[in-house]
Amino acid sequence: MNYPYIPHTDEDVRAMLDFIGVSSIEELFSSIPVSARSSLNLPESRDEFGVFKRLKEISEMNTSLEDHAVFLGAGVYKRYVPMVVYDLAMKPDFLTAYTPYQAEVSQGTLQALFEYQTMVCELTGMEVANASMYDGATALAEAALMSFRLTGKEKVVVARSVHPEYRAVLRTYLEKRGFTVVEAGYDETGRVLLEEVDEETAAIAVQYPNFFGVIEDLDYVRSRSGNALLIVVVEPVSLALLEPPGSYGADIVVGEGQSLGLPMWFGGYSLGIFATREKYVRQMPGRLIGQTVDQAGNTAYTMILQTREQHIRRARATSNICSNHAHAALIAAVYMSVMGPDGLREVARRSYSAAHYLQERLEEMGFKLRFSGEFFNEFVFNVPEDYPERWKWMMAKKILGPLPLKGFYPELGDTALACATEVTSKEDIEKLLEAMK
C-alpha cells in the first residue's frame, strides 16, 4: 500500500469488492455519469515535514492578536492566562465536552465542576450555579424562559444597554414562541430607564457593567422591578471589584465566562455562566453537580436533580443542554483557582485603571465621553464621521481600535466603544493615540 495510514490492504479491498459482487473500484463507481466526474486536482503528496511546513505557511496568513494593540472588547476580551491553566486543563483526563454521566469514573471532572459552581456563587453572590451554558447570550435567553416558568407571565423587559447580540438571541428564542420582548431605553448617564415595567412583566434584564461599560445602578433597577424577577448579565472579572448582583436582590445572574481564562478564538470558545437562588433551582437549566458521601464514607461528586433534564423527562425538561461547555467551565475553574481572589481583584483593578487612563488621554485630544455614568473597563466616546474608515486603516497597522457603534446604535451617531484590560500597555495606548490624530 502507498498510504500506510489507510488500514485496508489490497487483499481487504479485493475481499470487499468480491462480497458486493463487483470486479473493481472503477466498476463500483460506474453508475456516476462521466460528465459528473472530475479530477480532484490535489497537490502532490508530501511527507510529514512537508505537510507541517505547508500548514505553517497557511497559518501565518492569519492575524494574531499577540502582536496587535487591542482596544476592542464588546463582550470578548484580551487577557493574560497563566501557562499553568492550560497545562492542567488540557490533560487528556479532562479533555472532553461531554457530560460526566457516569459518576464512578468521572470524579476528577465532577469535582472540578463542583468547584467551578462554588466560585461562580462566590463571584455573583448567588446561592446556586450550574456547570455551564453555551455562552452569555443563550444563558440570558434561558434565564428569560426560566422567569416565564416561575411567574406564569410572558413578557420580559430588557435594557437597550444590554449587548445588542444578546438581545438579538433573546428575540430569536422568545418571539416565535409567542413571548413578548420590550426594550427599555437609557439616559445621558448611559444607565437604563425603566418605564415599561407593569404587572404583566415576568422579568427585567440589565447588564452590569452594561454594553457601554457603564455600571448600572442595581438599587434603582430593583426598586423599579415591582414583582418582576431581576436578571443581571455580568462580566465576571468586574465582580472582583464591584458589589455582586446577589447583594442587590438579583434573582438570576448570567454572563459570558470568556474572561476567565478562555482565548479570543473566532466564534468561540465561549462559556455561559448561570446562577440563581436556591428556591428556584428546579427551574434552572443546565447540569448541576452536587457533593455527597459514598457507601464507604468518602466524599463523592455526582450530577443531581436530573429529573429537570431531557435525558430523564424529555416532555417536561427545563434543561435541554446536550454536548456542553463543561470543559470551558473547567478551564475557568482552573483560572480562578490559580488567580485567587487577590489575583482576580488585581486583574480587575488594572483593567479599570488602564481604561480610565485611556479615556483621559483621548479627552486631552478632544474625544469627549458620550455618557457621564461611572464605567469599568469600557467607555463610549465621540469620533469623527470618517472613523469607520480609519478603524479599518488602523487594523492594517496592527491596531484593533475601539468598536464603531453606529451600526448597533444609530441614535448615538458617530461614537465608538473603547476597551482596555490588564494587558493594555501605555505603549499600546500611545500607538492608538497617534493613529487617532
UniProtKB/Swiss-Prot annotation:
Query: InterPro entries under this entry?
Result: GcvPA, GDC-P_N, GDC_P, PyrdxlP-dep_Trfase, PyrdxlP-dep_Trfase_major, PyrdxlP-dep_Trfase_small
Query: Which Pfam families does the annotation name?
Result: GDC-P
GO-annotated molecular function? glycine dehydrogenase (decarboxylating) activity
Please provide the record's keywords in A-Z order.
Oxidoreductase
UniProt EC number = 1.4.4.2
User: Record's superkingdom?
Assistant: Bacteria
Which reactions does this protein catalyse? N(6)-[(R)-lipoyl]-L-lysyl-[glycine-cleavage complex H protein] + glycine + H(+) = N(6)-[(R)-S(8)-aminomethyldihydrolipoyl]-L-lysyl-[glycine-cleavage complex H protein] + CO2
Any one GO biological process: glycine decarboxylation via glycine cleavage system
Give the matching SUPFAM superfamilies: PLP-dependent transferases
Q: Subunit arrangement?
A: The glycine cleavage system is composed of four proteins: P, T, L and H. In this organism, the P 'protein' is a heterodimer of two subunits.
User: What is the stated purpose of this protein?
Assistant: The glycine cleavage system catalyzes the degradation of glycine. The P protein binds the alpha-amino group of glycine through its pyridoxal phosphate cofactor; CO(2) is released and the remaining methylamine moiety is then transferred to the lipoamide cofactor of the H protein.
Q: Which HAMAP family match?
A: GcvPA (MF_00712)
What the record says about family reads:
Belongs to the GcvP family. N-terminal subunit subfamily.
The protein depicted here goes by the name Probable glycine dehydrogenase (decarboxylating) subunit 1
**Organism, as annotated:** Thermotoga sp. (strain RQ2)
